[in-house]
Amino acid sequence: MAGASGGVRFIPYHTAKSDNQFLGELCERLNSPDRVLPGGMIYMNDLILNPQIVSRLGEIIMQRSIELKPQYIMTVETKGIPLGLSAAKAFNIPMVMARKEARITEGPAVSISYLSGSTKKIQSMSLPKKALPHGARVLVIDDFMRAGGTANGLCELAEEVGAEVVGVYLFIAAKEPAKKLVREYASLLTLRGVDETSKAVDIVPEML
């Protein structure tokens, strides 16, 4: 792959078997009963904030979506940042970040309101107008998706500033609800179910 300055850049590809094993090991850790939080959420900060783990996740996303040829990675504060940066590093492209509230230090911004698919509440996010050039190919990345409200909001925000969303990639996507607010997406892991009473968690890897 061409480097940022035109030369050649080495891309550390892993085998599909190695990636599948790595993701399977993460599932074993995530399926621990003590990770279940109120509301059926799963504690995963220790994984997505681990430099070695999140770096490998970014490389896997790059390998599995390189044909999309993104020019920018886009995520939302705050938990999407580590995975977004790791994927951006693997692709050797910039990352832009949407905020829940615009900041005056970032200049004029475009803001949208969106319906959170999990909380069913109206929320907002903003992106500096200068963050993405018109026509830029954007890969949206986030840490978790249940109904897809946040991911859909990111897509709408990117399109609002004139960018083209070429894909949506998640670390974990919940199997239910089956009908998401985003039509097409991919994930590294799938949450098939969680029982708050028994503390049973069922997370499986998306194998290649």
In which residue ranges do the predicted regions lie?
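Short glycine-rich phosphate-binding loop at a beta-alpha junction
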Residues: 70-77
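Short Gly/Thr/Asp-enriched flexible loops that form oxyanion-binding sites at enzyme active sites
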Residues: 82-91
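Conserved acidic residues
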Residues: 71, 136, 166
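PRPP-dependent phosphoribosyltransferase catalytic core
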Residues: 3-5, 14, 19-20, 152-208
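Active-site/ligand-binding-proximal alpha/beta "capping" segment
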Residues: 136-160
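Short, glycine/charge-rich flexible loops or terminal/linker lids adjacent to PRPP-binding catalytic cores
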Residues: 93-139
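Active-site-facing substrate-recognition patch
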Residues: 2-69
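Short glycine/serine/threonine/alanine-rich loop segments
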Residues: 92-93, 163
